[in-house]
Amino acid sequence: MKKISVSRWITVWNQSHTNIRTVTPKYRTRTMWLTVPAAVSGERVRLRFSNKEGCTTLRIIQAAVCVNGGGRQPVLFCGKERLVLETGEECYTDEIPLRVEAGQYLSVFAAFRGDVTSGNCIAAHVQCSKDGNFVYAPQTDISRRSFMDSYWGNLPGIPAISGVEVLTDETPEVIVCFGDSITQQSTWTVPLERMLNDNGHPAIVLNAGIGGNRLLLGAPEAALQVFGPAAMERFERDVLGVEGVTAAIFALGTNDIGWIRKPEDIETAGADAVFAGLKSLTAKAHEKGLTVYAATLTPRNGSLDYSPEQEEERLRLNAMIRSAGCFDKVIDFAEAAADAADSGMLALYCDSGDHLHPSALGGQKMARCAKAAMTGSDRQGE
């Protein structure tokens, strides 16, 4: 009997939105050029634009998409070239008839009028033009970044777009990494996708990290909202709302514990409260048929304003995560990244320098740890 293939939308790239009004570059009345890899093949593409966390009206005056630098196809919104989204709104484009093969690259061009204040900063190839609409212009009209900006600006702001989807009959695992800056910075998410696919596990690893994000509470007033809404609040949108999602990695809690300033904060942001939040999200994910991986919190002794009381809560939370039976698997990032002589600190080669965020080498080690937990294999090429 011939097998009938069923096409469905699969997210090949996404980002969780936060307020980016303090992030550079500024896209006011400029054009964005974003290029992302397509991990599946298909005949149609659609994009999702968002102003969920913006504080100004989003105006797109023209957009287009192409494959591997080829001819650009117009992007329409209900048949129209322009889009206006008020604060809190998001929408899909019309379906775009565009053949894409797995391994090719999709480029998205969008010209804005006025400020753009909703987006994020994750690892992706994005460029910002000089003032004007350059949707159909050659690359030479994109603003040239200075040597220093190109060298240091590894995570420039990515405005407005929140998802790229391909209509396909392929069935890869789609894993959403739900976390904070340690996820957002992409040091472990990018190598994890490569390792899983090299290991014979077709997978798309999506980054739903927001820098400074907390599980239980939204951004403190002092953070100018760039730290985003509480993960508990954004879970439906940023995990369950992702087309094709099959699994989630929860890597949250370090900022809840990191904001503990007085004894009474432990009740609302300590290990017990964070673990209860993780259990609640796990139950919701399981209801939707998702596999849930929970990550332990990496060491951070020596980081700014980190106290022995906070470290005690981190250790308690990690012990709860390791011993809990509610998660499908546990990814022990804490063990993978810890210094051999002092488990409360990141290993020297895993430390980016602030004693909190992993280096590129640290991210590689965390990715190997995640791959081992997810596949049962502890060798990168296995």
Regions found by a protein language model. Give the residues of each.
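Catalytic His-Asp segment of secreted/periplasmic serine-dependent ester chemistry enzymes
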Residues: G258-I260, L297-E382
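N-terminal secretory targeting modules
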Residues: M1-F178, Q184, V190, N197-H201, ...
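A cross-domain feature marking catalytic cores of carbohydrate-active enzymes
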Residues: L252, T296-L297
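Conserved SGNH/GDSL esterase-like catalytic core that processes O-acyl groups on lipids
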Residues: I161-V164, T171-K279, S303-Y306, H357
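Surface-exposed acidic, glycine-flexible loop patches that form ligand/cofactor-binding
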Residues: L167, R237-E243, A283-K284, S377-E382
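Surface-exposed amphipathic alpha-helices with a cationic face
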Residues: L278-G289
